[in-house]
Amino acid sequence: MKQSVKKPPPPGDTTVRGELPNGKLEEAPPPVLPPPPRPMADKDTSNESSSGSATQNTKERPPTELSTTEATTPATPAPPLQPRTLNPASKWSKIQIVTKQTGNECVTAIEIVPATPAGMRPAANV
């Protein structure tokens, strides 16, 4: 009488449907790959701020358009605007943001506005 010797299936072989643990065929989940590195073109190399210009003169700029959801549902009502008063003992300086174009490059600089005596200052720029 000849005995049949059962060979174990090779590892990872799912085509053999012999004895299965717990009666279920288990499949390994797909491996999780790390995200690909960012291309160099997307990298921020400039010193620009995402907040934009912080100038006080808003009369020269056209009003920005709000999306329909922002225009119909205001978050909180804005308090009435009051003129600012400057403290003469303050160490802060007034600045101006200037952008100049040379060729195909733009250069943005912050210039310190020279201090003027309080009597010489126009009221609209305070």
UniProtKB/Swiss-Prot annotation:
Compositional bias segments (type: Low complexity): 64-75
Topological domains annotated Cytoplasmic: 1-126
Record's keyword annotation contains Cell membrane: yes
GO MF: G protein-coupled receptor activity
GO CC list: postsynaptic membrane
Start-end of Polar residues biased regions: 47-57
Presence of keyword Ion transport: no
Membrane topology: Multi-pass membrane protein
Renumbered residue ranges of the record's region Disordered: 1-90
Ranges of biased composition (kind: Pro residues): 28-39
Keywords of this entry: Cell membrane, G-protein coupled receptor, Membrane, Postsynaptic cell membrane, Receptor, Synapse, Transducer, Transmembrane
Subcellular location: Cell membrane; Postsynaptic cell membrane
Family statement: Belongs to the G-protein coupled receptor 1 family. Muscarinic acetylcholine receptor subfamily. CHRM4 sub-subfamily.
Free-text function comment from the UniProt entry: The muscarinic acetylcholine receptor mediates various cellular responses, including inhibition of adenylate cyclase, breakdown of phosphoinositides and modulation of potassium channels through the action of G proteins. Primary transducing effect is inhibition of adenylate cyclase. May couple to multiple functional responses in cell lines.
Name this polypeptide is given: Muscarinic acetylcholine receptor M4
Natural source organism: Bos taurus
Name of the gene: CHRM4
